[in-house]
């Protein structure tokens, strides 16, 4: 998956980013510089990947919990990436999880190149995020984490988003097929709740939907037994032109609602 072609693409992306930076030296957001001499700003809870040298041992002694000291000059922008690792991501001739994993890598690479801190979470291990910073030199840790993900079982995005430990304002990138029963049954409300929650937590939501060709264009006719990859529930359906048209109409309506929800607010 992460072959020479992928790294060549990243190299081209890096050159394009450097070219854009040279054309607009001021940038679109404030640059951050790390330094222990800066003015103290706040505490935040320790996350795997943080520098243990920055633990506040006095706080640990009082509360028996690990907190990191942050300073005004070293407060990084946070980019949290939630990767859907449910069984449905294994569907398709070209597996959806392959594209999802590559998207996660690209987003992480761009964030690290911007000197942001990247927090990687998967839906199966919400309380075990990987937090990396320090620029592109930390990218191999991202690749190692992504290569060790396993896909299977069920996930529920709304509850997953609410369980992720967030450290402050930032960007939340959710990578999923978004084909989950709660979202499909009451899609408008579910998406609205998820997006409202993220904005309440001062996160700018970015939803990246990964679908395979077999889902976008149904190529089957007659009566079929369909099996849910996550729950193994079975459904007997008769596929004809009218049923396929209704399916595709609902699928693109679902995608449209998600896109509209992210664009608003």
Please name every model-derived segment.
Residues 1-29, 44-50, 59, 68, ...:
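Exposed, interaction-prone extracellular/peripheral surfaces
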Residues 34-36:
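A positional/architectural concept
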Residues 53:
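DNA target-recognition patches
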Residues 56:
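Switch I (G2) and immediately adjacent beta-strands of P-loop GTPase domains
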């Amino acid at each position: 998956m992460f072959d020479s072609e992928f790294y060549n693409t990243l190299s081209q992306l890096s050159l394009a980013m450097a070219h854009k930076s040279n054309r607009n030296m001021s940038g679109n957001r404030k640059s951050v510089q790390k330094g222990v001499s800066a003015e103290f700003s706040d505490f935040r809870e320790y996350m795997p990947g943080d520098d243990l040298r920055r633990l506040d041992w006095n706080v640990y002694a009082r509360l028996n919990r690990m907190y990191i000291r942050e300073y005004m000059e070293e407060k990084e922008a946070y980019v949290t990436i939630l990767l859907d690792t449910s069984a449905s991501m294994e569907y398709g001739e070209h597996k959806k999880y392959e594209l999802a994993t590559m998207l996660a890598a690209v987003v992480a690479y761009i964030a690290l190149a911007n000197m942001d801190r990247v927090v990687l979470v998967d839906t199966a291990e919400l309380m075990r995020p990987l937090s990396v910073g320090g620029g592109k030199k930390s990218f191999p840790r991202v690749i190692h984490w992504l290569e060790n993900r396993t896909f299977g079982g069920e996930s529920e995005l709304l509850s997953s988003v609410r369980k992720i430990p967030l450290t402050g304002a930032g960007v939340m990138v959710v990578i999923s097929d978004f084909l989950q029963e709660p979202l499909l049954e009451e899609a408008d409300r579910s998406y609205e709740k998820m997006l409202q929650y993220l904005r309440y937590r001062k996160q700018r939501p970015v939803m990246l939907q990964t679908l395979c060709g077999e889902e976008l264009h149904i190529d089957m006719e007659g009566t079929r037994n369909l099996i849910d990859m996550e729950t193994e529930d079975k459904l007997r359906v008769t596929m004809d032109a009218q049923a396929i048209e209704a399916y595709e109409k609902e699928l693109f309506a679902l995608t449209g609602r998600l896109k509209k929800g992210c664009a608003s607010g």
